[in-house]
Amino acid sequence: MVGKSVVTLDGLSTNQILDLLHKAEYIDSHRKEVAHTCDGRVLATLFYEPSTRTRLSFETAMLRLGGKVIGFAGAQLASVTKGESIADTLKTVSNYVDVVAIRHPKEGAALVASRAASVPVINAGDGGHMHPTQTLADLATLQSRFGRITDLTVGLCGDLTFGRTVHSLIETLCRFGNVRFVLISPDELKTPQYVIDRINATDNCSYVEVRDLASVIGDLDVLYMTRVQKERFFNEDDYLRLRDTYILDEEKLQLAKPSMAVLHPLPRVNEIAVDVDDDPRAAYFEQVKNGMLVRMALESTVVGDELPGYEPLNSKEVHA
């Protein structure tokens, strides 16, 4: 993976994905030992779209490894306002840094960036397409909660049309197999056909589409909640009509398994009641920590810096 861009997780083998999860676990228990892994390295965070968690997570990951960060947060701060192309920006920034994290509202922007850059580019989310590092955070959370990322019934609820984290997670779980997906959404926000096709192409994965969360929550090992994304709507009336379709509260949680894990890519609006935060099944703030850890693992890997004392996955057993 040294020197390699990560636009989607499809470019990584399942063993490479598992090794990144393994590295993240190691980093969590060896914070002091890895604190100088990336001394002298510089990360550029090029965020053409607003972000809080993802940008800060990428930046904190490099800082905790001993590196430094430059970048911008918002297209209005970039030379795009002067008409500069993504390709030219990346060719320029490649002269300054060792690795780039890019977020952009247009699908395919990360691929364009990776082709133009002479350093590794990590996709921090492009349009409604892919969000590979969020998926790594999701997988790390499943691994820590269940000790595996297969043999699970995973419910995905809310905006399944525009939710890039949903698409990315489904497609990656299909590569490991043995997952039953329960797709919970209003008709207006159903899962895109290309994602359904991916499930259908996997022999040991299956799905059902439903509109009612309460009727299926008791069957779920994982409930992945998403917000209805106002920024994806052209008509505010449509957004307001769909915004409150699914709200997870303690009353609904009474119908769920005691071992179920509630995930959410954040930010939330009102789709998870605040009183759920204290429920032991709430795993979304664990996802935040895991997101930083997997980004530390990924950043150090693509620039070729080895974690002191780390034993590669092939010498240890990790269950998919």
Swiss-Prot record:
What InterPro entries does the entry give? Asp/Orn_carbamoyltranf_P-bd, Asp/Orn_carbamoylTrfase, Asp/Orn_carbamoylTrfase_sf, Asp_carbamoyltransf, Asp_carbamoyltransf_Asp/Orn-bd
| GO molecular-function terms, A-Z | amino acid binding; aspartate carbamoyltransferase activity
Keyword Ribonucleoprotein present in the record's keywords: the answer is no
Give yes or no: UniProt keyword Transferase. yes
| Enzyme Commission code(s) on record | 2.1.3.2
Which biological pathway? Pyrimidine metabolism; UMP biosynthesis via de novo pathway; (S)-dihydroorotate from bicarbonate: step 2/3
Q: Provide the reaction this enzyme catalyses.
A: carbamoyl phosphate + L-aspartate = N-carbamoyl-L-aspartate + phosphate + H(+)
One Gene Ontology term of the biological-process aspect is:
'de novo' UMP biosynthetic process
Q: Which Gene3D superfamilies match?
A: Aspartate/ornithine carbamoyltransferase
UniProt-annotated binding residues for carbamoyl phosphate: 53-54, 103, 131, 134, 266-267
Write out the residues that bind L-aspartate.
82, 164, 227
What superkingdom heads the lineage?
Bacteria
Similarity-based family: Belongs to the aspartate/ornithine carbamoyltransferase superfamily. ATCase family.
Instruction: Return the protein name.
Output: Aspartate carbamoyltransferase catalytic subunit
Origin organism is Bifidobacterium longum subsp. infantis (strain ATCC 15697 / DSM 20088 / JCM 1222 / NCTC 11817 / S12)
Source lineage: Bacteria, Bacillati, Actinomycetota, Actinomycetes, Bifidobacteriales
Q: Which gene encodes it?
A: pyrB
